[in-house]
A protein has these predicted regions:
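Ankyrin repeat A-helix N-terminal signature
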Residues: 29-34, 62-68, 95-101, 128-134, ...
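Bacterial N-terminal signal peptides
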Residues: 6-15
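Ankyrin-repeat-protein effector appendages
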Residues: 17-27, 144, 177, 210, ...
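Conserved ankyrin/ankyrin-like repeat signature
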Residues: 38, 70-71, 103-104, 136-137, ...
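Ankyrin repeat boundary signal
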Residues: 49-52, 82-85, 115-118, 148-151, ...
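N-terminal segments that cap or nucleate solenoid repeat domains
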Residues: 21-62
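Ankyrin repeat domain, specifically the short helix-to-loop turn at the C-terminus of the second helix
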Residues: 43-48, 73-81, 106-114, 139-147, ...
Length: 313
């Protein structure tokens, strides 16, 4: 009886707008809401199980991104294309992984979902789970055979993305399952740099315990500490120095770390670096010392600090 009523309402809706059935994504709405009776009514009356909206999002995708397990099971049993991709390359598995719906994820994988399919940015469901901090889904995907060192089109690893979000439980899952700490993206940045650049203090602490390369160089010969100083992330700076980061490093242009702190007018950072033994008279590619740059800023406290530490022109 419920099926008959749902079917009647469905066709009333169609004819009231005088448009073709295939133009009405009613199946998608029902799938999203978990309205299994309406979904069955539409499919059993001849509706396509692979109906799409204008962005090629299918009913299975609608069900997957709303954790509608019963609807997803039914659609799959009726021949829904598990690996269908929408306009941006997302699959039902990607939607479920992004939202940490592990029951849907497991159902899709058991139904033949391809773990290696990538979206338009080069990411698999695995990467999308990592960016969302969904460590339960990550763990499941790894157990199903995904490579923990999967990269996207920019050679960014899942560990790097997890560092950006700063989700420590996710980092634990990745590292415990073989994610490599010192891999580099196309710019030469490691996972540690990703943590540093987003000022992820807890994630940085966690990563440092696992002994990544502390002075890894990117394509411009910047180290994690140089990035932290440039961005004036004092807590991160202290963490890196505690783990023996080189405070006297220069980038590929010959600019020393302390110069970035001086230009930022970060008096506390400069004071800290001095206390840790930085070369206060180091010069850059132009032969200019930190004192010269301090004078340029006209920051009296900075000038006095550097002079009191023995800074010269």
């Amino acid at each position: 009886m419920k099926i008959a009523i749902s079917l009647f309402l469905y066709f009333c809706f169609l004819f009231s707008y005088s448009i073709k059935a295939e133009d009405i994504p009613y199946l998608l709405t029902a799938s999203s809401k978990g309205d299994i009776e309406s979904v069955k009514a539409i499919i059993e009356s001849g509706g396509s199980v692979n109906t799409e909206d204008g962005n090629n999002v299918t009913a299975l995708m609608y069900a997957s991104r709303k954790n509608q397990v019963e609807v997803a099971k039914y659609l799959i049993s009726k021949g829904a294309e598990v690996n269908k991709q929408e306009i941006d390359g997302w699959t039902a598995l990607m939607y479920a992984s992004k939202n940490n719906y592990s029951d849907i994820v497991e159902l899709l994988i058991e139904s033949g979902a391809d773990l290696t399919i990538t979206d338009s940015d080069g990411w698999t469901a695995y990467g999308l789970a990592a960016t969302s901090g969904n460590h339960q889904t990550l763990d499941l995907l790894i157990k199903k055979g995904i490579n923990p060192n999967t990269r996207n089109s920019s050679s960014t690893t899942v560990l790097m993305l997890a560092c950006k979000s700063g989700n420590v439980p996710t980092l634990k899952v990745l590292i415990n399952n073989g994610a490599l700490l010192n891999l580099k993206d196309k710019f030469g940045k490691t996972a540690l740099v990703y943590c540093v650049n987003k000022n992820q203090i807890k994630a940085t602490k966690f990563l440092l315990v696992h002994q990544p390369e502390i002075d890894s160089l990117d394509k411009f010969e910047w180290t994690p500490l140089m990035w932290a100083v440039k961005k004036d992330y004092f807590e991160i700076i202290k963490l890196l120095v505690e783990y023996k980061a080189n405070i006297n490093h220069k980038d590929d242009e010959g600019t020393p770390i302390i110069q970035y702190a001086v230009e930022n007018e970060s008096v506390d950072v400069v004071k800290y670096l001095i206390e840790k033994g930085v070369d206060i008279n180091v010069t850059d590619q132009y032969g200019l010392s930190p004192l010269v740059y301090a004078l340029k800023t006209k920051n009296k406290a900075m000038v006095e600090l550097i002079r009191s530490a023995g800074g010269e022109y």
